[in-house]
Amino acid sequence: MNSSCEKIFGVLRSPRVSEKSSRLQEISNVYVFEVSSDATKVDVKNAVERLFDVKVGVVRVLNVKGKSKSFRNRGGSRSGWRKAYVRLIDGQSIDVAANV
């Protein structure tokens, strides 16, 4: 693999599939991805455009805080992660299950 492919797969970790993300796909043409913690909007946009061969309109990125958990009176927390909402230009679509 060349370095550009490694960078793309380093930025995009996995698609997030949930009821909310499915609804966003149908209504607004928005796809949700889990991305690396140091990825920027520009990195995410370039990775999606190169990997799926589509045109990206808007990228919104946010940090998701890990949940607090306890097990046998010991406190702990799950690690946080970074989420990206990617809106495609009208007429474009991604088959997330097939490509990733």
From Swiss-Prot:
GO molecular function terms attached to this record: rRNA binding; structural constituent of ribosome
Disulfide bonds listed in the record: none
GO cellular component: ribonucleoprotein complex; ribosome
Organism of provenance: Xylella fastidiosa (strain 9a5c)
Keywords: Ribonucleoprotein, Ribosomal protein, RNA-binding, rRNA-binding
Biological process terms in GO annotation: translation
Quaternary organization: Part of the 50S ribosomal subunit. Contacts protein L29, and trigger factor when it is bound to the ribosome.
Family: Belongs to the universal ribosomal protein uL23 family.
Name listed for the protein in its UniProt record: Large ribosomal subunit protein uL23
Signal peptide: none
Keyword Isomerase attached: no
Biological role stated in the UniProt entry: One of the early assembly proteins it binds 23S rRNA. One of the proteins that surrounds the polypeptide exit tunnel on the outside of the ribosome. Forms the main docking site for trigger factor binding to the ribosome.
NCBIfam families per UniProt: PRK05738.1-3, PRK05738.2-4
